[in-house]
Amino acid sequence: MPNDNRLAPAALAAQAAALPAAWRHVLEQPAVARAFASVLGHVEQRLAEGAVVYPATPFRALDQLAPADVRVVILGQDPYHGPGQAQGLAFSVPDDCKCPPSLRNIFNEIAVDYPRPTRHDLSAWTRQGVLLLNTSLTVEDGQPGSHAKRGWETVTDALIAEVARDPSPKVFLLWGAHAQAKQALVPADAGHLVLAANHPSPLSARRPPVPFVGCGHFRQTNAWLQQRGQKPVDWSGEQNNASRQGEFAL
């Protein structure tokens, strides 16, 4: 049986209210509050009508990280729309789920320079300051993009802008046109690094202008962070294995 990752009625509002203050104040900005109220109304209406909505924890990407804790931002589009998949972290699925094609290509790219990840759950990245944020935080079963343009983009744009305003150095990994459209939210003089490539989906990963395959983003991210006195990210997700830490430095 797949994990039960269905959103429960009233859970979205409760989770928003429980967010850390650094994120909650973003949702309280007037324009963002109006957009979130619109999203919330639509989600609750669809749940009342019997729709299955994923994931159970839409705000999970924000739970363990304040804006100042974020070192890398990876943007997705909307959650996986199959049962048991979406976890509230972009690209991540439970370990017992089959590895989705885009995540497989991400792992292939990591394996060029580092040990290949063995876990499909990317929580270990989050614990190292990697924000895995979808631009739409809910989706209906079997209907990709079903909650896009319902107000989520206003909410997540404000969250991205809040991260970009924080002065600590950050890397923004923008894969595909949808993510790259968010580059305008990252001021050019903010001292952050923006790396862009095609989406890791098999449909686009090898296409020009900047193929995802061979982009070297994970190596470049670590090199840039280390140049600024920060620890590299253990992209293998096995940061507790001290004997392998040196493999993630350049």
Curated annotation (Swiss-Prot):
It catalyses: Hydrolyzes single-stranded DNA or mismatched double-stranded DNA and polynucleotides, releasing free uracil. It holds the Pfam family UDG. NCBIfam families: PRK05254.1-1, PRK05254.1-2, PRK05254.1-4, PRK05254.1-5, ung. This is Uracil-DNA glycosylase. PROSITE patterns: U_DNA_GLYCOSYLASE. Disulfide bonds: none annotated. Its main location: cytoplasm. Keywords: Cytoplasm, DNA damage, DNA repair, Hydrolase. Residues 228-250 are annotated as: Disordered. The active site is at 78 (proton acceptor). Excises uracil residues from the DNA which can arise as a result of misincorporation of dUMP residues by DNA polymerase or due to deamination of cytosine. GO terms for cellular component: cytoplasm. It is found in: Cytoplasm. GO terms for molecular function: uracil DNA N-glycosylase activity. It comes from the Bacteria. Its EC number is 3.2.2.27. GO terms for biological process: base-excision repair, AP site formation via deaminated base removal. InterPro entries: UDG_fam1, Ura-DNA_Glyclase_AS, Uracil-DNA_glycosylase-like, Uracil-DNA_glycosylase-like_sf. Belongs to the uracil-DNA glycosylase (UDG) superfamily. UNG family.
